[in-house]
Amino acid sequence: MTRLFAVTNTRSAAWNHALPMEEQEDWKAHAAFMDALQAEGFVVIGGPLEGTPDALLIIRANDAEEISSRLSQDPWRRKGLLATTRIIPWTLRLGSLG
């Protein structure tokens, strides 16, 4: 049975801090990969946490291992631009995701 998880990612060693996110190496491949995960319902919502090197994803999955496995295919992870820092089961108690 699937459930929700809060996942945080952070910029890794290969991140070029002189460039904006959209100009990082393989931006288009990363964006297409994430868009596909969102289109299939794996990624529910997500985006950068302003003022930090981190991003937050809300993911629907069976377990943390599934998340790690799926996200390991991200072109930015393979290039060393991103790393997952936390995968935590999350319960939505206020509002809705539609």
Feature names for model-found ranges:
Residues 1-98:
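Conserved, structured core segments of small domains
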